[in-house]
Amino acid sequence: MVWKGVPMKKLLFIVNPRAGKTKSRAPLFDAVAQFSRAGYLVRVYITEAGGQARDITARWGGQYDMVVCAGGDGTLNETLSGLMQLEQRPLLGYLPCGSTN
């Protein structure tokens, strides 16, 4: 539920579409819907190359209340590396979607 007059929290959602064995992304759409219902304004970035999760997090992460990444251990590592470059670090969430998850 979102209350009128209460500013929405901002969430940066980084998705690695190449992670894991499955091609179904329905759970990720469900996650975005859940965050939205919880009062977050969600910005989704789909990575296209290695290192991009780190770069996106380092450049934009400081403007968000929470950064959530969906991917494998490499995506999580990149996102953490990007967060370490920030003076003010937002909360971190992880949706494991790697080949061993």
Placement of each model-derived feature along the sequence:
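Small-residue-rich beta-alpha loop regions that form the catalytic core of phosphotransfer
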Residues: 9-101
